[in-house]
Amino acid sequence: MKQLEELLSTSFDIQFNDLTLLETAFTHTSYANEHRLLNVSHNERLEFLGDAVLQLIISEYLFAKYPKKTEGDMSKLRSMIVREESLAGFSRFCSFDAYIKLGKGEEKSGGRRRDTILGDLFEAFLGALLLDKGIDAVRRFLKQVMIPQVEKGNFERVRDYKTCLQEFLQTKGDVAIDYQVISEKGPAHAKQFEVSIVVNGAVLSKGLGKSKKLAEQDAAKNALAQLSEV
């Protein structure tokens, strides 16, 4: 934890008062499960809080930045900015991936590189920062880390995989595309959806996500990857 404290202080001018919050933010459920007897806390609740404050701050930014954009346009752009892949990228940019505590099995299976885990970690850190320093500290951190990328327009070029897949399949003729929810697991604040894409009655691909929409996008992305190999 000492190295993480030094990283936050030197890179982002952040010094936590409650180090327990910081440690919890960087503790994955797999680690907590392996240390149940020690009553170790994990970061899912902080992730829930961080997701909410991130949505609020990015919404405020977009509302002020784009006075002529419609609600629908701003919602799309916000979704691009806070999508799992983006948040995982910011975790890596901040070197957070080096400090998360994972269970042995999760570590061996490549969890430290997994977008889902790193995206959740970024949100959990925001939740911990909110509780320790307040919302203005979260705003300052996001202005330093995320907003410059938004200003460059990097997120406006993110692909809508569902639209790309539909356009690709339409070039092959008349096709019927159906997105079907296979499973829905986890508590209300940490859902995990699995979705399949059925094309003309046959399963083309599957995807995972924290919402139906994210799972559909993941399934479409996987389908495009498969089709590019054919």
From Swiss-Prot:
Domain RNase III span(s) in chain numbering: 1-134
Lineage per the UniProt record: Bacteria, Bacillati, Bacillota, Bacilli, Lactobacillales
Domain DRBM: 160-229
E.C. designation(s): 3.1.26.3
NCBIfam families named among the record's database cross-references: RNaseIII (TIGR02191)
Entry coiled-coil feature ranges: none
Keyword Repeat: no
Functional description taken from the UniProt entry: Digests double-stranded RNA. Involved in the processing of primary rRNA transcript to yield the immediate precursors to the large and small rRNAs (23S and 16S). Processes some mRNAs, and tRNAs when they are encoded in the rRNA operon. Processes pre-crRNA and tracrRNA of type II CRISPR loci if present in the organism.
Active site per the UniProt annotation: D51, E123
Main subcellular localisation: cytoplasm
Complex and partners: Homodimer.
One Gene Ontology molecular-function label: metal ion binding
Keywords assigned: Cytoplasm, Endonuclease, Hydrolase, Magnesium, Metal-binding, mRNA processing, Nuclease, RNA-binding, rRNA processing, rRNA-binding, tRNA processing
Alphabetical list of CDD domains matching this protein: DSRM_RNAse_III_family, RIBOc
Cofactors, names only: Mg(2+)
Keyword rRNA-binding: yes
Family: Belongs to the ribonuclease III family.
Binding site for Mg(2+): E47, D120, E123
Protein name according to UniProt: Ribonuclease 3
Reactions performed catalytically: Endonucleolytic cleavage to 5'-phosphomonoester
Compartments in which it is found: Cytoplasm
Organism whose genome encodes this protein: Streptococcus pyogenes serotype M28 (strain MGAS6180)
Entry-linked SMART domains: DSRM, RIBOc
